[in-house]
C-alpha cells in the first residue's frame, strides 16, 4: 500500500473505491479523515511496517463506506478517538435514529448494520458544529458543515490547508458511471455543493476518488449539480399518470437501469430514489393524495 503525499504532513491511501486522507501530528502519529469503505489488512500492515500510530479518526460522515476500518483501528490502538458532527453521531445512536436519518426501513435491518459497523465499543464523539473545529495536541482541524449527502456531513480541513470534502461531491469519473448518487436531503446537498465551489482552499480530496485543485473544483461542482437536476427531471417525468410510491419508484429505477435485488443495500437504494420525490413534493412539483402521487402541473386535470 502506498502513501501518496500531498504536503509534508498530509497525504492519503487508496482503499477500494475511496481515498482515505491523513495528517501527521508527528513523524509517526497521524489523524485519519474517515477509515475507508472496506476492511483493509493492507492498511494495518502498512501501519505496522512504518510504525505509525493513528491517534484519531475524523469522520466526514458515518456511512458504512467511510467507517469500515474503525473496529480494526480500535483493536490496534485502544486509545484512538473517533469524531463526527453531533448530527452524524446521533444518526447511529439507535435503530430508530438510523431509520429516521439513514434510510433504513426496519429496526431489524438497522440493528444488523449497527452490530457490524457501529458496535457499542466504538464511541464516536459528536462535535457541535457551532464550534466547527477539533484540536488535537496543538493542531486544529477546521470543520465545514456540508449536509445533504447525509444528515450532518462535514468537510475537514487539515492544519496545513488540505480540504477533505468526503462525499459532498463526487469526482468526474464517478459521476459519469453513477446511476443515482446518494442524497439524504436533496435541497441541502445542492446548497452544500454550491458552498464547496466558494471555498478558498487550493487542494481538495474527494473521497471517491480524486484530488483536485481550486481551479478545477467549480466545474466539478457544476457537473454534480447538473446531474442532480437531470435525475430530478427524470423522476418527475415518471409520473405520466397517478401512481403509488412503489409503482413510481419501480419505474424510476428501471429507467435508470438499477436492478432490483434483495438485501439491506437495496433498502438504501430505494430510499435514495425516494429522496428525489420528497424533494419534488417539497418544491410543490408533485403532490400526494389518497396514496397516489400526481404531478402538480397535471393534478387538477387528473383529479377532475
Regions found by a protein language model. Give the residues of each.
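Metallo-beta-lactamase
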Residues: 140-229
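Active-site neighborhood of phospho(di)ester-bond hydrolases with catalytic His/Asp-centered motifs
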Residues: 32-36, 55-63, 83-86, 145-148, ...
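C-terminal regulatory/interaction regions
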Residues: 237-304
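Active-site HxH/HxHxD metal-binding segment of metal-dependent hydrolases
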Residues: 39, 45-133
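A short catalytic or substrate-binding loop motif that flags glycine-/basic-rich loops and adjacent residues
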Residues: 15-18, 128, 147-150
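Conserved beta-strand hairpin/beta-sheet module of binuclear metal-dependent hydrolase folds
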Residues: 1-50, 155-166
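Pre-recognition alpha-helix immediately N-terminal to the DNA-recognition helix
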Residues: 230-238
Amino acid at each position: 500500500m502506498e502513501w501518496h503525499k500531498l504536503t509534508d504532513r498530509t497525504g492519503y491511501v487508496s482503499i477500494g473505491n475511496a481515498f482515505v486522507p491523513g495528517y501527521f501530528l508527528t513523524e509517526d502519529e497521524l489523524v485519519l479523515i474517515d477509515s475507508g469503505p472496506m476492511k483493509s489488512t493492507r492498511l494495518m500492515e502498512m501501519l505496522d511496517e512504518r510504525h505509525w500510530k493513528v491517534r484519531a479518526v475524523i469522520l466526514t460522515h458515518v456511512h458504512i463506506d467511510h467507517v469500515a476500518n474503525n473496529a480494526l483501528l480500535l483493536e490496534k490502538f485502544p486509545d484512538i478517538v473517533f469524531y463526527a458532527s453531533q448530527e452524524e453521531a446521533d444518526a447511529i445512536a439507535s435503530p430508530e435514529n438510523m431509520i429516521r436519518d439513514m434510510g433504513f426501513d426496519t429496526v431489524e435491518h438497522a440493528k444488523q448494520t449497527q452490530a457490524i459497523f457501529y458496535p457499542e465499543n466504538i464511541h464516536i464523539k459528536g462535535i457541535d458544529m457551532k464550534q466547527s473545529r477539533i484540536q488535537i495536541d496543538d493542531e486544529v482541524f477546521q470543520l465545514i458543515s456540508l449536509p445533504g449527502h447525509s444528515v450532518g456531513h462535514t468537510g475537514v480541513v487539515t492544519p496545513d490547508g488540505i480540504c477533505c470534502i468526503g462525499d459532498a461531491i463526487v469526482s468526474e469519473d464517478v459521476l459519469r458511471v453513477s446511476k443515482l448518487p446518494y442524497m439524504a436531503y436533496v435541497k441541502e446537498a445542492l446548497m452544500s455543493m454550491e458552498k464547496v465551489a466558494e471555498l478558498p482552499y487550493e487542494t481538495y480530496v474527494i473521497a471517491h476518488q480524486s484530488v483536485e485543485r481550486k481551479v478545477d473544483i467549480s466545474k466539478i461542482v457544476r457537473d454534480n449539480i447538473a446531474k442532480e437536476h437531470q435525475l430530478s427531471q427524470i423522476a418527475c417525468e415518471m409520473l405520466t399518470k397517478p401512481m403509488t410510491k412503489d409503482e413510481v419508484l419501480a419505474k424510476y429505477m428501471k429507467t435508470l437501469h438499477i436492478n432490483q435485488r434483495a438485501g439491506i443495500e437495496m433498502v438504501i437504494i430505494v430510499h435514495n430514489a425516494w429522496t428525489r420525490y420528497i424533494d419534488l413534493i417539497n418544491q410543490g412539483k408533485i403532490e400526494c393524495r389518497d396514496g397516489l402521487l400526481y404531478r402538480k402541473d397535471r393534478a387538477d386535470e387528473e383529479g377532475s
